[in-house]
Amino acid sequence: MASSQEKAKTGVLRNAAALLDEMQLMGETQGAKKVINSELWHACAGPLVCLPQRGSLVYYFPQGHSEQVAATTRKIPNSRIPNYPNLPSQLLCQVHNITLHADKDTDEVYAQMTLQPVNSETDVFPIPTLGAYTKSKHPTEYFCKNLTASDTSTHGGFSVPRRAAEKLFPQLDYSMQPPNQELIVRDLHDNMWTFRHIYRGQPKRHLLTTGWSLFVGAKRLKAGDSVLFIRDEKSQLLLGVRRATRQQTMLSSSVLSTDSMHIGVLAAAAHAASSGSSFTIYYNPRTSPSPFVIPVARYNKATYMQPSVGMRFAMMFETEESSKRRYTGTVVGISDYDPMRWPNSKWRNLQVEWDEHGYGERPERVSIWDIETPENTLVFPSSTLNSKRQCLPGYGVSVPGMEIGSANMSSFPRAQGNPYGSLQHIPAVGSELAIMLLNQSGQTLGSPLSFHQSSYSSIIQNVKQNYIPPLTVSTSACLTKQESLPSDDAQHQFHMANMQNGDLEGSEVQPVIDSISESKLNATSRDPRNTDSYTSRSTSEQNSKGEPRGKTRRSKKGLPHKTVSEKSDLSSAPSWICDNQQVGLESKLVGCDEQVNCGNIEDSSGALTQGNFVGQPHGHQVEQKGVLSPPKVESSKSPDGGKSVNSFPNQGCFSQFIDGLDWMTQPSYYQDSNVIQPAGVSENIFSSSADIPPSMIADTMETFQASCLSDCLPNSIQEFISSPDLNSLTFLSPDMQNLEVQLQHDGSNLPSTSNSFVQMSFSEESASQSANLSGLHMESTHRSINTTSCSQPMSTGGFDAGMYSKLPRLKESQILSLPEIHTNSMGTSACSMDATEYSLDRSAKPMKPPVRTYTKVQKQGSVGRSIDVTGFRNYHELRSAIACMFGLQGKLEHPGSSEWKLVYVDYENDVLLVGDDPWEEFINCVRCIRILSPSEVQQMSENGMHVLNDCIQAA
């Protein structure tokens, strides 16, 4: 019994092997026939046609096949066509064979496919390799031209563009007069045609003369038809023809009626679905409105993303001369195309509305696999985090080789664990309106880039940590957690800070110290003339100490700190140890659960310097996270050794000056309001200016300050702040204004200070410090400041005038000296703010609008130009203007009929084709426009996008 089974099994295998040999023999016999060149067939079929591979799985849509029949016969089937209940709307099949064909009379291309239904994707059959099969491939080098009347005349010739002739035809011998050669080309049917290629005329051009008229007559070509020349992978020169779509003037020669053809298509598919047998279909790519044999992978990818009403999409269409263009639109409905015959069918179940109208017909209903959505491509606008956003001026991402933009919104520090949190401001000039705009833009930001982490935030971190506001009675709830330090320590702190900075010279310094001391002893008293006793005692204690004077030097990273509180985690010490005296403020603590720390700092000489504050009359002391490295200021001679000392008697005052004036608009000031956290550990990145020549420090710092300001402020804010009409005194309290007037009246000769504050050292740890100020939560008011941390800027009223007695004359200098900063939107200002929106204690004059910048237009070999894209209403006007600028009239206005292309770089560094995006979005995100010649277009398609980047860098 077993032997008989083995014999039967062996016989089956022998028969299967014989059958396979016979199939291969048949394939070789079929292969003996001339096979149509796949590249030429695809060139004639169109750039969007892609046939499935043999043996692959596809979905066959009978509904789409019926559309092809209707398009071929130009007749819609009537209601007498029967329904086939057992025929599903889509049929999973395996491709057994594909054969390429071309009509001998018209050269119309079509494909014959043999399909076999399968139950699932696992039910596939092994397909033997037949010699007649060739893989589908598109040509890489081709030229297509729509024939004109002169091209089809019997006595004329065929004009070939110079670039196409030089690329496809053999090189001419220009030593001949005139240069000419004989071309031998083959068509779809392997027929040979001979043309004479000559270079003549005025101006000279490439022409096909002898033999061309014979070809036009034999093919019955008319104006509007297209001719294609390609060079295949074997370097053979091939010739194809495309017929223009014309109205049918005569009845079809087919003996079958339109209804019979529809019935035949549906009946064959229904029989195959029920029996599982193979069936044959014919696909005409030039006639069929849409392909109806879809690869399973393409179908699954499209249906994985569930479509929804309002979804944005794009779809590729073939335009003139075998070019492609992407059109965008919106899904406006989802419903069955033919609910009676094909319920629940995915064929054309999307109702769409196109952004542009005209320039060819586009269907009102499409299938999900025919479109590109934001989820499966990065070219189109998306509603996700990677969406195209309104580009806020000054926050663009740099394009390689183009000096456009210098900062990124992702560099703004945010709360730890909440990188997408909203930004919070510290009260300063224009901060409320700036934050409103930045929050609107920041809501769609992606994850911050590590290499864009701002180093400015590290500097602000150290600057802000120097400042501890005095606590009022309303903050007594938080003072229970704080430790009190002896008053002797406070005096020692005051002494060490003054020893560090040197003695103060001149009688005019004494009233300043008096006013500062008084403001610290009595928060309710604003009179700086009642503190002589305290100042004298402080000065005498300073002189009684025997520690040496002078500045201490430290490395750029500083030395570790010793803390008083176990909770404090101190940062590195700066090069200057400043006095942490503070101006009395009327402040109240909002929801403060953190303990404000004040640490001890041990300098390189071993002397322990305590940074504390003289707080309220009750003597409450607070702890400080770090201290401030003071800026370079004008110096005077100390009476003991002629050493250069700072002009400011109190560096805490200068910290306020930094907070209130020059640093008030830095990116690090915008903090996260969702999570209140204490400042974390930070590495000091200050270096002592004693090691660097003063001139170098001043130049470096002025450049650094200008770059900081240019990074964080839009144009309208900068022009508002830097306006000559906006005087610094308007931001001071009435006491300060009176003090300034008094100083000018007395003729006090006050030394001027440099706007350069610190020597910035880009340490490795600076990138991680930008989120350390997330504990700040301040709200700007006119006379009070609410704070939950150890920072307080001078932005509005509610501060003492004594701290400004040593500042330069504010009327003689502006708050900010900003260079003109161009917006990154290249032609439009995305910042829609007005100076009149600022709520200030003055009547601000209406400001003139910011100077509009222009978009660069570049072309290889030509001088770049600038253009205002907002001055145009649509793409056509823009193309016409650019064409006139570079003498390319007629080459840019119609992208479908020209080999010249216009591309642009947006602020996300994406290179897109001009015309893909809606006009309003284009003018807001364009950074640079580039004109690509046909050779550059071809080179880019071969070598990738780095070719365009190289061109941009070279320009």
UniProtKB/Swiss-Prot annotation:
Residue pairs linked by disulfide bridges in the UniProt entry: none
Source species, domain of life: Eukaryota
Domain PB1: 852-936
A GO CC annotation given for this chain: nucleus
Positions of region (Disordered): 518-573, 609-646
UniProt keyword terms in alphabetical order: Auxin signaling pathway, DNA-binding, Nucleus, Transcription, Transcription regulation
Classification via SMART domains: B3
PROSITE patterns: B3, PB1
Feature: DNA-binding region: 143-245
Function statement: Auxin response factors (ARFs) are transcriptional factors that bind specifically to the DNA sequence 5'-TGTCTC-3' found in the auxin-responsive promoter elements (AuxREs).
Family stated for the protein in its record: Belongs to the ARF family.
Subunit: Homodimers and heterodimers.
Notes concerning its domains: Interactions between auxin response factors (ARFs) and Aux/IAA proteins occur through their C-terminal dimerization domains III and IV.
Protein's UniProt name: Auxin response factor 11
Biological classification of the source: Eukaryota, Viridiplantae, Streptophyta, Embryophyta, Tracheophyta
